[in-house]
UniProtKB/Swiss-Prot annotation:
Family to which this protein belongs: Belongs to the bacterial ribosomal protein bS20 family.
GO biological process, one term: translation
Parts forming coiled coils: none
Entry GO terms, CC: cytosol; small ribosomal subunit
Claim: rRNA-binding is one of the keywords in the record: yes
Keywords, comma-separated and alphabetical: Ribonucleoprotein, Ribosomal protein, RNA-binding, rRNA-binding
Function: Binds directly to 16S ribosomal RNA.
InterPro entries, per database record: Ribosomal_bS20, Ribosomal_bS20_sf
Record HAMAP family: Ribosomal_bS20 (MF_00500)
Gene (name only): rpsT
Pfam families: Ribosomal_S20p (PF01649)
UniProt GO MF annotations: small ribosomal subunit rRNA binding; structural constituent of ribosome
Protein name: Small ribosomal subunit protein bS20
Length: 99
């Protein structure tokens, strides 16, 4: 059978620039999602090092948490306040372990 032609009433007409923006938004969504996942992974790694009471690894992981969260803000993935909350929680956990 021949392929079915789309019904013109159901097709949304878009300008080429709008089509490009849709594709670009989809690409950015994938990139942003993977970066958010990376942040979550690093935070979990930091929390795991806290449970092991490994001071050197904890401080190293704290620096990586700070770094990756700041990069997320720079890229526009996180807002400033969300980054501040994540960093504050991490620092509070380290200080609670130290005392």
């Amino acid at each position: 059978m021949a392929p079915k032609k789309p019904n013109k009433k159901n097709v949304i007409q878009r300008r080429p620039s709008a089509e490009k923006r849709i594709l670009t938004a989809q690409k950015r969504e994938l990139i942003n999602h993977s970066f958010k996942s990376k942040v979550k992974t690093i935070v979990k790694k930091f929390e795991a090092s806290l449970k092991l009471d490994d001071t050197q690894a904890t401080l190293s992981n704290l620096q990586s948490v700070y770094s990756v969260v700041d990069k997320a803000v720079k890229r526009g993935i996180f807002k400033d306040n969300k980054a501040a909350r994540i960093k504050s929680k991490a620092t509070l956990k380290v200080n609670a372990r130290a005392s």
